[in-house]
Design a protein with these regions (language model features):
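Transmembrane alpha-helices and adjacent helix-loop boundaries
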Residues: 1-226
Length: 226
């Protein structure tokens, strides 16, 4: 293959792969927001003393964690269509991925909340704060040190899991690579490039997570010294 042919291929691949990478990042961001908000609500429900609230949250979390992501994506995309709700691929993917990661984020939130000493709950109630005020002003701010590193890891995993959306024809990075492979018959080169693009997108998040873990470790160490 001549240099001119390689340049022509690169000129065709580059804009398509960059557009697909942008789509992947957008999908990741929207699904992450859905997961973070829904996960917090699930965690609060899971911690409720009322079983009518905590039990459905537990069942949902166990169902999501016990079934494949792809199954959940197909349930959202195809099952809703059976009742007349036809979602575009992007909306179906971000809803399915967001609700999937909500279950994992709920457990992250719960672990962070439960890491705060029970005495702080009791002290807040002693000065007249409601349960909601205690959670908002006392517990959640302190639990961030525990919550943020695994939440960052969830963002990395979510970005990689967007590849399943290619199976419902969402034009993300893996689908675009598959289409280009069918056109150019160069699978090894394309998938190596796509793998490198995923690494470039996730590496800054990995560095941020490591920094948060170091900060959390220093916080725990200074707390023990006191």
């Amino acid at each position: 293959m001549s240099l001119a042919e390689l340049q022509a291929i690169a000129a065709d691949w580059t804009p398509q792969l960059l557009a697909a990478a942008g789509y992947t990042l957008k999908m990741t961001a929207v699904a992450y927001i859905i997961g973070a908000v829904a996960g917090l609500l699930l965690a609060l429900a899971r911690l409720s003393q009322r079983r009518v609230i905590s039990l459905p949250a537990l069942v949902y979390i166990e169902f999501i964690r016990g079934t494949p992501t792809l199954t959940q994506l197909f349930l959202v995309y195809f099952s809703l269509a059976l009742v007349g709700i036809v979602l575009p691929a992007f909306e179906a993917a971000v809803i399915a991925l967001g609700l999937h990661y909500a279950a994992y984020m709920a457990e992250t939130y719960r672990a962070g909340i439960e890491a705060i000493h029970r005495g702080q709950h009791e002290a807040a109630q002693a000065i007249g704060m409601t349960r909601a005020e205690t959670m908002r002003y006392i517990i959640l701010p302190q639990s961030l040190r525990v919550i943020l590193p695994p939440m960052g890891n969830s963002a990395i995993s979510l970005m990689k899991d967007t590849s399943v959306a290619s199976l419902i024809s969402a034009p993300e990075l893996m689908l675009r690579a598959h289409d280009l492979t069918s056109e150019y018959y160069m699978p090894m080169q394309l998938y190596l490039i796509v793998g490198a693009m995923y690494l470039i997108m996730t590496y800054p998040l990995s560095m941020a997570v490591r920094h948060l873990e170091r900060m959390a470790g220093k916080g725990r160490l200074s707390g023990r010294r006191r």
